[in-house]
Amino acid sequence: MAPGAPSSSPSPILAALLFSSLVLSPVQAIVVYTDKEVHGAVGSQVTLYCSFWSSEWVSDDLSFTWRYQPEGGRDAISIFHYAKGQPYIDEVGTFKERIQWVGDPHRKDGSIVIHNLDYGDNGTFTCDVKNPPDIVGKTSQVTLYVFEKVPTRYGVVLGAVIGGVLGVVLLALLLFYLIRYCWLRRQAALQRRLSAMEKGKLHKTAKDASKRGRQTPVLYAMLDHSRSTKAASEKKTKGLGESRKDKK
């Protein structure tokens, strides 16, 4: 390289920006959701739900693919495909006349319904979603169990037991607080009654004392009057006796 010629190596700032754009920028993959398992009775129908999350807007090239692997089988076969706004049911397998498309791509829903269930339908169903340019991600699987009569799920029984226990506890607490409220109300009424009786006794005592206070001077006055009358009568009697002696 000739002296004074500009350097052809990238600047440190440009190298750092390139490194951050390639390494540090997050890579977001499409995420597919299904139930873990579903139960159905022979002759009934069951819905296999499938939804997804994507960092991109819903594309016109959005596609859903359902595959089925029989119970104990090794290979999975395609049973349903949705692309370009049209559902396609594969002509291979026993589901070709029993599958119904019930999904809504605008709501990111790729669900299907399987009608007229049979014991041979037991197996694993896989939902795969592509939303270009977001095409990288894992599929999701749901296992179908077909019974003569759908058994009550353990979670439902446990939930019912827990709900019953909580109901009994709440009822007991309500009854306790109701009894306590009635008892406190009765005690308050009794306390008010006793307080009123005490006030009545005090008022009566004060009234009697006031009455006795008013009667005492009258009694003393009557007693003095009686004494004065008696003294005057005795004096008069004594004077009459002395007068009779003088006449004799």
Curated annotation (Swiss-Prot):
Entry's transmembrane regions: 156-176
Side of membrane Cytoplasmic, spans: 177-248
Residues with glycosylation annotation: N122
Tissue expr: Found only in peripheral nervous system Schwann cells.
Region feature (Disordered): 224-248
Quaternary structure note: Homodimer and homotetramer.
GO biological process annotation, one example: cell-cell adhesion via plasma-membrane adhesion molecules
Compartment(s) where it occurs, according to its Swiss-Prot or TrEMBL record: Cell membrane
UniProt key word NAD: no
InterPro entries cross-referenced by the UniProt entry: Ig-like_dom (IPR007110), Ig-like_dom_sf (IPR036179), Ig-like_fold (IPR013783), Ig_sub (IPR003599), Ig_V-set (IPR013106), Myelin_P0-rel (IPR000920), Myelin_P0_CS (IPR019738), Myelin_P0_Ig-like (IPR047014)
The protein's name in its UniProt record: Myelin protein P0
Gene: MPZ
SMART domains xref list: IG, IGv
Pfam families per record: Myelin-PO_C, V-set
UniProt modified residues of type Phosphoserine: S210, S226, S228, S233, S243
Keywords: Cell membrane, Disulfide bond, Glycoprotein, Immunoglobulin domain, Membrane, Phosphoprotein, Signal, Transmembrane, Transmembrane helix
Cited PROSITE patterns: IG_LIKE, MYELIN_P0
